[in-house]
Amino acid sequence: MKKDSLKKLELEATQEIVIQTFINDDVRRNDALLNFIEILDKIDGSVMISLDAEWGAGKTFFVKQIELLLNYYRHCSFGEETISDLDTAVNQKQRFRSLEMKNTFIPIYFDAWMHDDHENPMISLLYSIIEQGYVKEKFVNQRSLRKGFADVLSGLTIGNVNIDLDKMIDSPNDFFSAVKSTESIKKSLENVFDEIITEHCQKLLVIVDELDRCRPDYAVRILEKTKHLINDQRVMFLFSINKTQLIHTIKKFYGDSFNASAYLNRFFDFEFNLERIDTDLYLDYLDAQRQGHLYSQKLISEMCTYYRMTMREFNIYYQKMQYIEGKIGQDGFSEISFITRLFASIIWALKIRNDEKAQKFINGDLQEELINIFKKVHIYNVYVCRYIAKEDYDELEALCALYDFMFSSSASDSFKTNTIEIDAYHRKEFFRILWI
């Protein structure tokens, strides 16, 4: 990526990119991926599983890789054609190559957030199960499957409108038009699952992603309806969530005094946590050629670690800092490059993690943040000590004095030590570069 250009770094979870991230294992999550699949294969019965991680931590990529590999192993089990690149990658990874699964799975991916404008979440979810079950498995009788789905929908009431079953069966676009009441939802669901599962896999894994981003009423209803209506022993659910945010979402629905944590424990039989990425490894992935200034690369990595950034936050920070590097140049030392690396690195990290603190820092009211970084971020300390002062000067005192000069309204006309001098021109250029 050119240093003076901006490009979205967050990758879309397309099949091609999901395969490539598995092949390269750029963020070292293949071990976690394999461990999850091995555990999943050992679980008996109908269960609801949570995969917990922060927003932007890469949950969608992880569950998409689960979907990819479960399909791969099922195709292998039935002697069906597999994706050549994926087949090559699996055969090159000993643990994945030697994995023997006792069950075959059809994974169904459902983005809850994309459907939270629908009144009845179960209709959206079941529609995804039916359509993906058919689209991925051509052998399923489409008309029979839709007939079973129509029977299920007839038990999910929206208003008082009766469904036209023949129209629904022949016109999939009319699936959401209307429903009528019945007492046979569970039996109808069992029939639907029979159509998908019988002879073609042992289990369905329904992956529900982005639930914590949904409307509170939608998130609550999808949890409750899933638990109460679907208890087929062949069907498992994996909910990809940020548990902390989902707890807030539930409290918005039931009230702040509601014990949302205990409430969630009623639904999830197993809970898995997705570990944070290794920032150094991820930086290697983003900047494989190491074309940038060595200090700036190390600083990005250590600052992301210090502020505990998620993968998405890392992408934003990396993009901004690389762009700034392109503006200050990399040909040796300059006063502008020095103060920009010192302060822009903190300001943009704070803006990503806590915009209010970023504003306090810019206003000159957060010197303690600077002191903490000087003490705890090794490469930052090295850079300060290398350039800001020599001999009789205390580096931390000099750094704090430079901070006051840059961000205090009562600052003097310049900052000077025996190694560097920063004046009003440098300060003006810094703020110009900062907000480009």
Sequence positions of predicted segments:
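Residue-level preference for the first positions of well-ordered beta-strands
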Residues: 46-50, 107, 203-205
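The catalytic "switch" region of P-loop NTPases
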Residues: 2-20, 24-33, 54, 69, ...
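Residues at the beta-strand->loop junction immediately N-terminal to the Walker
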Residues: 50-54, 111, 208
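Conserved AAA+ ATPase small/helical "lid" subdomain
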Residues: 86-87, 141-162, 270-343
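Walker A/P-loop-proximal flanking segment of P-loop NTPase domains
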Residues: 1-96, 422-436
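Conserved Walker B
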Residues: 208-214
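P-loop NTPase nucleotide-binding core
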Residues: 57-195, 367
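C-terminal alpha-helical "lid" subdomain
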Residues: 298, 302-306, 311-436
